């Protein structure tokens, strides 16, 4: 797999929260960090995502969102 993005984190799916339009994917990276991504449910289905499946979190600086619990 070749990508232009420089930040590619290998990991596994910890959990999926599927909705009618979007799915929240909780990923644990090889380094032990957790990344949560929101993707379309159609994409989650197309990728056949399931808990424990090996995945890659691809992060481009222009597409990162930051939030707080406050």
Model-derived regions: residue spans:
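Non-catalytic connector elements of ABC transporters
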Residues: 1-70
């Amino acid at each position: 797999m070749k990508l232009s993005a420089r930040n590619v984190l290998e990991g596994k799916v910890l959990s999926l929260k599927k909705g009618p339009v979007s799915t929240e994917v909780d990923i644990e990276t090889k380094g032990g960090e957790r990344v949560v991504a929101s993707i379309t449910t159609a994409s989650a289905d197309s990728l056949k995502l399931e808990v424990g499946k090996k995945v890659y979190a691809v992060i481009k600086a222009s597409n990162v969102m930051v939030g707080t619990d406050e």
